[in-house]
């Protein structure tokens, strides 16, 4: 369950790219502190961070360090270890769940989920490997 956080609290963002930058910029304008984890010193969201952790996204200890500095944690993309997130979400306040992450990491599951909610999608087929494809 997500708890309400008020300005002055810290939002942790895994990923310092364009989406992280937009979130950090808006949050700073509202009075929040920002902690960012990204492997690049040159990530575009770094300029808005109060705390910056340079680390790969699969570095469990560094991701947990970000969590310890944060009142709520989010991620800007789906290239994160869902199993690691599953462990961390039991202890820390994540906006997205590991289950949501697992769905967004696989386009077929993503489309199936959208259709289960009656959200229109383009037609698609499920292909597991090259034996599922006929080439003339």
Where are these regions (language model features)?
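ATP-binding N-terminal substructure of ATP-dependent carboxylate-amine bond-forming enzymes
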Residues: 1-105, 109
């Amino acid at each position: 369950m997500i708890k309400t956080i008020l300005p002055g609290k810290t939002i942790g963002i895994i990923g310092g790219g364009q989406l992280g930058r937009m979130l950090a910029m808006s949050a700073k304008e509202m009075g929040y502190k920002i902690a960012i984890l990204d492997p690049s010193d040159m990530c575009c969201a770094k300029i808005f961070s109060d705390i910056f952790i340079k680390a790969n996204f699969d570095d469990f200890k560094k991701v947990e360090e970000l969590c310890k500095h944060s009142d709520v944690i989010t991620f800007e993309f789906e290239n994160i270890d869902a199993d690691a997130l599953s462990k961390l979400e039991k202890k820390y306040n994540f906006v997205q769940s590991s289950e949501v992450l697992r769905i967004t990491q696989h386009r077929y599951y993503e489309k199936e989920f959208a259709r289960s909610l009656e959200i229109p999608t383009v037609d698609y087929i499920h292909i597991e490997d090259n034996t599922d494809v006929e080439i003339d």
